From Swiss-Prot:
One of its GO terms (cellular component) is plasma membrane. Binds 1 zinc ion per subunit. GO terms for molecular function: metalloendopeptidase activity; zinc ion binding. It is an enzyme of class 3 (hydrolase). Its cofactor is Zn(2+). Residues 278-309 are annotated as: Disordered. This is Protease HtpX homolog. It is a multi-pass membrane protein. The active site is at E132. Zn(2+) binds at H131, H135, E207. Its EC number is 3.4.24.-.
Length: 309
C-alpha cells in the first residue's frame, strides 16, 4: 500500500473515530462538531504537525556552529542518501532516542535527545541518524506526524468522554440511541486503544524497512544494531517523558515496557530488529529458515540501496 493511500486511510479512520466519540458525547450535534474538529485537525496535521511535536518536546534547533559534529554526520548521510539537508533539533532529555518529522523530504526535521549524544558512540549515533533519514527517504514522516497529532486529539476527546461519564453524560433523553454512562466510560477506554492500534498498523512494518534502508545509507548495519541494544537498555533505566500519541515516531518506543504496552507496541520487538540487522533473521540461527530470511533481508537492503542511487 502506497504512503498516499496509507495517509488517506489513516485520516479517514481517525476522523471516523472522532465522529463516534462526538456522537456519544453530544448526539448528531456532537458528531457534526467532531467532524468539523477533525477537518481542522487534518489541516493542522498536514501543515503544522512537525511544529506541534517539536514544541511538545521543547526541542531546540542547532546550527553547524553550535553542534559541528552532529551536523557533519547528518550532512554526510544525506549526501549518501541523495536527500536535502533537514533541520536538526536536540531534545533536552537524558534517555537516548530520536525521531524524524515533517511533511516531505524538503521540509524534514531530525531530532535527537541529549542522552543519545552523551551515551552512544559515533558509529551508533550514525546508525540511528541513518535510520531516521531512512524514514524521510521512504516518506514515512508525514503519516507518522499526522498519526501523532490525530491520536493526541482522540485521546483528548476520550478524556472528555470520561468526564462526561463522571457527570452523567451530556445528551438529552430524546436523542436517537441515547448513550449511557457505561457507554461513555467504555468509549474513554476503547478510543485511546483504537488510536494505538491504528498507529501500530501504520508504523510497525515501516520500522523493518527503515532499519534496512538505514543500514544501506550508513554502510554499517552493526552501528544501528548496537545502538538499538543500548536504546532498549537505557529506555528501561532512564524512562523518557513521552506522550503516548507520539511513541511510534521514535527510533525505539519511549513507553514503559509493561505487558500492556508490549501488546500495543508501535514498534516490532527490538530483538527481532537487531537479529535482522546482524543475521538477516529474527532468530540468528543457522537453519534453513534463517538462510531464507537472510537472503530476503539482503534483497530488502539491496532494494533500499538501489533507491538511494
Amino acid at each position: 500500500m502506497g504512503n498516499k493511500i496509507r495517509t488517506t486511510v489513516l485520516l479517514a479512520a481517525m476522523t471516523a473515530l472522532m465522529m463516534i466519540i462526538g456522537q456519544m458525547l453530544g448526539g448528531r450535534q456532537g458528531m457534526m462538531i467532531a467532524l468539523i474538529f477533525a477537518g481542522v485537525m487534518n489541516f493542522a496535521s498536514y501543515w503544522y504537525s512537525d511544529k506541534i511535536v517539536l514544541k511538545m518536546y521543547q526541542a531546540r534547533e542547532i546550527t553547524p556552529e553550535s553542534a559541528h559534529g552532529l551536523y557533519a554526520i547528518v550532512q554526510r548521510l544525506v549526501q549518501r542518501a541523495n536527500l536535502p539537508m533537514p533541520r536538526i533539533f536536540i531534545i533536552p532529555q537524558d534517555t537516548p532516542n530520536a525521531f524524524a518529522t515533517g511533511r516531505n523530504p524538503d521540509h524534514a526535521v531530525v531530532a535527537v535527545t541529549e542522552g543519545l549524544l552523551n551515551l552512544l558512540d559515533e558509529q551508533e549515533i550514525t546508525g540511528v541518524l541513518a535510520h531516521e533519514l531512512a524514514h524521510v527517504k521512504n516518506r514515512d514522516i508525514l503519516i507518522g506526524t499526522i498519526a501523532a497529532t490525530m491520536a493526541g486529539a482522540i485521546m483528548m476527546l476520550a478524556s472528555m468522554a470520561r468526564w462526561g461519564a463522571i457527570f452523567g453524560g451530556t445528551r438529552s433523553s430524546d436523542d436517537e440511541g441515547g448513550s449511557s454512562v457505561i457507554g461513555l466510560i467504555a468509549l474513554s477506554i476503547i478510543a485511546p486503544m483504537a488510536a494505538m492500534v491504528i498507529q501500530m498498523a501504520i508504523s510497525r512494518s515501516r520500522e523493518y524497512l527503515a532499519d534496512a534502508t538505514g543500514a544501506a545509507i550508513s554502510g554499517n548495519p552493526e552501528g544501528l544494531a548496537s545502538a538499538l541494544e543500548k536504546l532498549g537498555t537505557y529506555s528501561k533505566q532512564i524512562p523518557m517523558r513521552a506522550n503516548p500519541s507520539t511513541a511510534h515516531i521514535f527510533t525505539v518506543s519511549p513507553l514503559s515496557g509493561t505487558t500492556l504496552m508490549n501488546l500495543f507496541s508501535t514498534h516490532p520487538p527490538l530483538e527481532s530488529r537487531i537479529a535482522r540487522l546482524r543475521h538477516g533473521s529474527d532468530s540468528g540461527t543457522g537453519n534453513r529458515d534463517s538462510s531464507i530470511r537472510r537472503r530476503n533481508m539482503n534483497t530488502e537492503a539491496k532494494a533500499a540501496w538501489d533507491r538511494l542511487r
